[in-house]
């Protein structure tokens, strides 16, 4: 015992020296990578500024954006051993998106996403593997499948709107729209992706596991039982297993010659027709991509639908024109579905939807990792291993006419600012990893705007800071969009 204490005492100076050397080198390497870019002069050892990020994400990223104004559109920081660069300038963001390749950048979607989502996630693929999966996925978002999805989307949306009408349309008490819309989106995603293979128990399992997973995207990356991140990672594994069962049932159904009725059916229908099956078409591999879709559609759509309600309530003239556009094709009393052709003809509502996505892009940033040193500007080379955060939000307020104004007409056929400033409209990304489901997402937003605005009058409950942005994990209004709802229908549809 005495010898152990003596040994420890003799080693203590060396251990302390090694620790001090490590801390000194950590600061030195940070300063060397930082060079003359704006950012903290010194960072907290090991964890960096992750506590500030977890405590108040909005404030953290606002400060990074403000610092980037003082340079070439870049600022830096340090998070749990990772040097990060925030990219505010739209052209530099385009440069990152256009260089996803083995010797430049890899999309990570989340600073610790690979550990959270798993190796088979489409997010982390590039090269031939990524092209192979995209070739399988892309046909599932063409006109015929989208038309089938639209019918399913409307059934779910209308069912939830009727429930809201029964519960809240008296207008006697306000309701926070966030949870209502979140539940609507989760059921819509489940129904469109794997609907025929879900019973009530499986739906509840997916909902519960997703609710465990979601907080993990905003937690410290401690992968241990009882910690939010660790529980989230295990929830992803359970979601993949659940989706794998649906994929297997779909393959059996398509092999029997039945017609596809949901996304996984359209996908497996083409797979069973090939012999041998294409690469990356195993049950687990397909289910991993379906979980990616679930994450993308759930939180991103919740954000966009919430902001649609917020912005329509604050813009009465826009809301009036939306209702006029809907009335040309559809009425809740008609008990008819909106057809694919009618959906395409709702041009003003589509402009409103696109402006919602520009004004408040659901994912404010899309993290990438530098696979090797990359010369971003004439004066700065991004070091290998750096996590870069191109800001879609900041890009949306560059170039456009009066960018701080909510103006759907900028997307009209006359002005076409989406084409004129397409390098600034990055909500769905660009390049090889551009969102494959963007037409589906836009249709979902258009359908919700059309149906919700036709069925309800809504009045926002104003409070201090209600319009402030919070990241949970996508951008949402701070108050969850609290409104009074009242039915516009004489009788229930």
Swiss-Prot record:
PROSITE patterns: CYTOCHROME_P450 (PS00086). Disulfide bonds: none annotated. It is found in: Membrane. CDD domains: CYP61_CYP710 (cd11082). Its EC number is 1.14.19.41. GO terms for molecular function: C-22 sterol desaturase (NADPH) activity; heme binding; iron ion binding; monooxygenase activity. Expressed in stems. Detected in primary root caps and immature petals. GO terms for biological process: sterol biosynthetic process. It holds the Pfam family p450. It catalyses: 5-dehydroepisterol + NADPH + O2 + H(+) = ergosta-5,7,22,24(28)-tetraen-3beta-ol + NADP(+) + 2 H2O. Its cofactor is heme. Its main location: membrane. The keyword Isomerase does not apply. It is a single-pass membrane protein. InterPro entries: Cyt_P450, Cyt_P450_CS, Cyt_P450_E_grp-I, Cyt_P450_sf. Belongs to the cytochrome P450 family. This is Cytochrome P450 710A3. The gene is CYP710A3.
């Amino acid at each position: 015992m005495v010898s152990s204490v003596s040994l420890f005492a003799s080693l203590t100076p060396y251990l302390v020296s090694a620790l001090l050397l490590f801390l000194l080198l950590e600061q030195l390497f940070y300063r060397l990578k930082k060079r003359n870019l704006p950012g903290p002069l010194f960072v907290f050892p090991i964890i960096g500024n992750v506590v500030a990020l977890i405590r108040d994400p909005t404030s953290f990223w606002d400060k990074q954006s403000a610092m980037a104004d003082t340079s070439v559109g870049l600022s830096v920081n340090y998070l749990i051993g990772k040097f990060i660069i925030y990219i505010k300038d739209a052209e530099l963001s385009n440069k990152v998106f256009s260089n996803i390749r083995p010797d430049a950048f890899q999309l990570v979607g989340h600073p610790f996403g690979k550990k959270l989502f798993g190796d088979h996630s489409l997010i982390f693929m590039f090269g031939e593997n990524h092209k192979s999966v995209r070739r399988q996925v892309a046909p599932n978002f063409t006109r015929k499948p989208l038309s089938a999805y639209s019918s399913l989307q409307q059934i779910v949306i209308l069912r939830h709107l009727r429930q809201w009408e029964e519960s809240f349309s008296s207008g006697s008490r306000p309701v926070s729209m966030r949870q209502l819309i979140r539940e609507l989106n989760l059921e819509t995603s489940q129904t469109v992706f794997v609907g025929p293979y879900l019973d009530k128990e499986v739906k509840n399992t997916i909902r519960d596991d997703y609710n465990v997973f979601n907080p993990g995207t905003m937690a410290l990356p401690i992968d241990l039982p009882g910690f939010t991140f660790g529980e989230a990672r295990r929830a992803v594994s359970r979601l993949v297993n659940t989706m794998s069962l649906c994929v297997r049932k779909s393959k059996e159904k398509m092999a029997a010659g039945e017609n596809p009725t949901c996304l996984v059916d359209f996908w497996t229908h083409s797979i069973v027709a090939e012999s041998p099956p294409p690469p990356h078409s195993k049950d687990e591999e397909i289910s991993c991509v379906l979980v990616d879709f679930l994450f993308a559609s759930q939180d991103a759509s919740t954000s966009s639908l919430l902001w649609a309600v917020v912005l329509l309530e604050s813009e009465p003239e826009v809301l009036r024109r939306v209702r006029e556009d809907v009335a040309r094709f559809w009425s809740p009393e008609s008990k008819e579905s909106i057809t694919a052709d009618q959906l395409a003809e709702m041009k003003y509502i589509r402009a409103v939807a696109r402006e919602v996505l520009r004004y408040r892009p659901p994912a404010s940033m899309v993290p990438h990792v530098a696979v090797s040193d990359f010369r971003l500007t004439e004066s700065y080379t991004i070091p290998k291993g750096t996590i870069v955060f191109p800001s879609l939000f900041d890009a949306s307020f560059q170039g456009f006419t009066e960018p701080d104004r909510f103006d759907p007409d900028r997307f009209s056929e006359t002005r076409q600012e989406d084409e004129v400033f397409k390098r600034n409209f990055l909500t769905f990304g660009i390049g090889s990893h551009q969102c494959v489901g963007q037409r589906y997402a836009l249709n979902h937003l258009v359908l919700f705007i059309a149906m919700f605005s036709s069925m309800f009058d809504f009045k926002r409950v104003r409070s201090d800071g209600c319009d402030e942005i919070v990241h949970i994990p996508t951008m949402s209004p701070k108050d969850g969009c609290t409104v009074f709802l009242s039915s516009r229908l004489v009788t229930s549809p």
